Curated annotation (Swiss-Prot):
Functions together with the other V-type ATPase assembly factors in the endoplasmic reticulum to efficiently assemble the V-type ATPase membrane sector V(0). It is found in: Endoplasmic reticulum membrane. Residues 1-20, 68-122 are cytoplasmic. It comes from Saccharomyces cerevisiae (strain ATCC 204508 / S288c) (Baker's yeast). The keyword Nucleotide-binding does not apply. Residues 42-46 are lumenal. Belongs to the PKR1 family. This is V-type ATPase assembly factor PKR1. Pfam families: Pkr1. It is a multi-pass membrane protein. Residues 82-122 are annotated as: Disordered.
Length: 122
């Protein structure tokens, strides 16, 4: 039992999901839903607890869906994320310098056009 909690705590610092995290999630939602069922019974069917039960059930379904989608995606570690960020930064710098060169060319062309139109008017 203690090993479960140790692995659960360690899984917090790892990317992705672990079996301990999934089990803890399901146990938490079952406890929440059982508590809401008991509150519905204890309050003779208070509508607010029905609403909370529905919201909790839909949230649990959404979390299950998200966990399944997350298991299909390849997660990147920090080194891969740094490499991708550096590539994006390098390409952005390169694009900015190309844009500045092109805008400099278009500015000089616009100046020549303005000078020509002034000389025609004179």
């Amino acid at each position: 039992m203690a090993n479960f909690f140790v692995r659960l705590w360690e899984s917090v610092f790892e990317p992705g999901t672990s079996p301990q995290l999934i089990i803890a999630t399901h146990v938490s939602f079952v406890a929440l839903l059982l508590t809401l069922i008991w509150l519905i019974y204890a309050t003779n069917g208070n509508i607010h607890f029905y609403a909370l039960f529905c919201i909790s059930l839909l949230l649990w379904i959404t979390v299950i869906w998200f966990i399944n989608e997350l298991s299909h995606v390849k997660l990147k570690d920090n080194d891969e994320l740094d490499k991708d960020a550096n590539k994006k930064d390098d390409s952005a710098i390169k694009e900015d310098s190309e844009d500045k060169q092109e805008s400099g060319k278009s500015t000089s062309t616009a100046r020549r056009t303005q000078a020509q139109s002034r000389s025609r008017k004179a």
